[in-house]
A protein has these predicted regions:
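Hydrophobic N-terminal alpha-helices or hydrophobic patches in metabolic proteins across all domains
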Residues: 2-320
Length: 320
């Protein structure tokens, strides 16, 4: 099956032709089977680091230009991997800047890392987001009675392979959990890479417990306690922490996709940067020349800085 190309003005050079934007100093890695590449700028483990996305020779926004659906007929979705399994750096699409590169979250001037709450180390799944979705902070969800968290909808990919930051993978949705994080609705999708050996056996949320016993319980516990070492209370959930089924999850995805579509038509002042390079007729359309300028203005790549050994520290926590 051929990869689905983002809709709109996407100019790809013919095979063998030199890419027209070769002036950009890049470190590229090809994401599996989909034609997406990533472009590193700045220095890893510093505030300057950022990861831009391309499709073919064209810069794109992973938030707005990668289609939500990978294959509508087979109900599979695209996932942008922000944080590979077992890692601690809190990476996420930067929703407030042009092209929405992946950056490490910063809190009080410091790079943010999740703590290792025993027995978990870092993130226990490949973690990321579904593109072309948005949890609207102006929308009060009737399931949680809380507003959205102003981000694309989060997703935990539970397969065996440790993905790479910036991978774009096709996933099958299995279920969803409704985390309430500091008073905001923060949906957590459960999914599996369609190429995972278990994918054929996992079709809904009940199949996770059957074939991966303990995964849902561990996911609930991880989200409940992961902020406690930072001095915050345990997180709470709607539905008493129950993971809802695939049908429910896909309704939530559709709802957040509609919120994203409305966002992309807004022309008022918004903290979200809606720049797109592929969606013709959109008020936020950006030319490739403008996109290249954004990337070249970012710091040039440098050798990665080391991480503090304290990142590997265990934390033993209880929920009060």
């Amino acid at each position: 099956m051929l990869p689905i190309v983002p809709v709109g003005r996407l100019i790809l050079s013919a095979a063998g032709q030199r890419a027209p934007y070769s002036s950009v100093h890049v470190v590229q890695q090809v994401t599996k089977a989909m034609g997406y590449t990533t472009v590193e700028r700045g220095t890893l483990n510093t505030t300057s680091y950022c990861l831009y996305f391309k499709y073919g020779d064209s810069f794109i926004s992973p938030f707005h230009d990668i289609p939500m659906l990978a294959d509508e007929a087979n109900r599979t979705y695209n996932m942008v991997v922000e944080i590979p399994r077992w890692t601690n750096a809190k990476m996420e699409m930067s929703t407030k800047e042009p092209l929405n590169p992946i950056r490490q979250d910063i809190k009080e001037g410091n790079l943010r890392y999740v703590k290792n709450c025993f027995p978990y180390h870092g993130y226990i799944w490949n973690y990321g987001a579904i593109p072309q979705t948005w949890e609207d902070p102006g929308f009060i969800d009737t399931n949680t009675n809380c507003k959205g968290d102003n981000d694309p909808i989060d997703i935990c990919e539970i397969g065996y392979r440790v993905a790479k930051r910036g991978d774009v993978i096709r996933v099958k949705i299995l279920g969803i959990m409704a985390l309430v994080d500091e008073g905001e609705t923060d949906w957590k999708l459960l999914a599996i890479d369609v190429n995972d050996p278990l994918a054929k056996d996992l079709n809904d949320v009940q199949d996770i417990e059957k074939h991966m016993p303990g995964m849902i319980e561990a996911t609930f516990e991880w989200f409940r306690i992961y902020k406690i070492p930072d001095g915050k209370p345990g997180n709470r959930f709607a539905f008493n922490g129950e993971a809802k089924n695939r049908e429910f999850a896909e309704r939530i995805i559709a709802e957040t996709h509609n919120h994203w579509k409305a966002l992309m038509q807004r022309t008022d002042t918004s903290p979200i940067n809606s720049s797109t390079t592929t969606l013709e007729g959109n008020p936020h359309l950006m030319s490739q020349q403008e996109a290249e300028s954004v990337v070249t203005s970012a710091p040039v790549p440098g050798p990665g800085a080391g991480q503090d050994a304290a990142i590997d520290k265990w934390y033993y926590v209880t929920v009060k």
